[in-house]
């Protein structure tokens, strides 16, 4: 093994990167790639072919912005490669051929995607070794557990992922159709009804900020509708927006997807259904170790509400919800822990193994 391992957690909304053994990621930037809208004119005045992360955000007026990861799954590999290139060379300032790499993946990531990630790391970046791990499994590891159920809700996807002795149980992983981006869009819709229009990509970022600063989960939705108070939020241009029950109505989509016009179970019911798909002997361990992870679980009040609704499903079971601080990057922290273990080198796919077996080696070594 060459230098210390680089850990990259690629989320739909944010990319987190840093060195194994660190407590927090060194780099966090939006998972976006911007291409100039008018290519020829832009090139003449010295602009680049593409921009990544914060730089793409700052130039969003002249760029077409794209998220290469949607609902946790990569959908544009050229843009994804740009994000990794930016991560290594601009954010981390390392030569990728000198460092083993740990990448994270969404639960139920298609096999072809895992192979493509592996291929790009070895062929485009000449990594000496690499490993792929499921985000929720790393989040559980970050909480100091090997068995439990992780309720992971980020910007693009939410999942209930039961894990036994460090291995996810794929047959029982369930996806929830609401995540952070849905909350932001729903809040924008409600603000429009109040007469505040947020239409551009730039304005949507303001809505996201309002959500992150003011949103919360109501313990009792109907009661909260009667008693909710209003708050003011100052926009960058100095105007003031008044926000009332929108503060908790936006996060209610995690519990009542009908608000988004969908007919699917909310977070507590999906978590319960996931546990019930597992062997009866381990259910007690899952109910007793429910770990929240991902940025969307940072919304105040979520743990109490999940506890209340799960208890209604299973009144006799002891239910324990763990909401670690810093859980918006707990997958990265779990990756940092895993990649600093003395056994990590044996776990990795080496360049030699890749050259002998090709990308499909990832299914044998990373599970």
Curated annotation (Swiss-Prot):
Actins are highly conserved proteins that are involved in various types of cell motility and are ubiquitously expressed in all eukaryotic cells. Keywords: ATP-binding, Cytoplasm, Cytoskeleton, Hydrolase, Nucleotide-binding. Its main location: cytoplasm. The keyword Repeat does not apply. This is Actin, spherule isoform. It comes from the Eukaryota. Belongs to the actin family. InterPro entries: Actin, Actin/actin-like_CS, Actin_CS, ATPase_NBD, Heat_shock_70_CS. GO terms for cellular component: actin cytoskeleton; cytoplasm. One of its GO terms (molecular function) is ATP binding. It is an enzyme of class 3 (hydrolase). It catalyses: ATP + H2O = ADP + phosphate + H(+). The lineage of its organism: Eukaryota, Amoebozoa, Evosea, Eumycetozoa, Myxogastria. Pfam families: Actin (PF00022). The keyword Transmembrane helix does not apply. GO terms for biological process: phagocytosis. Its EC number is 3.6.4.-. It is found in: Cytoplasm, Cytoskeleton.
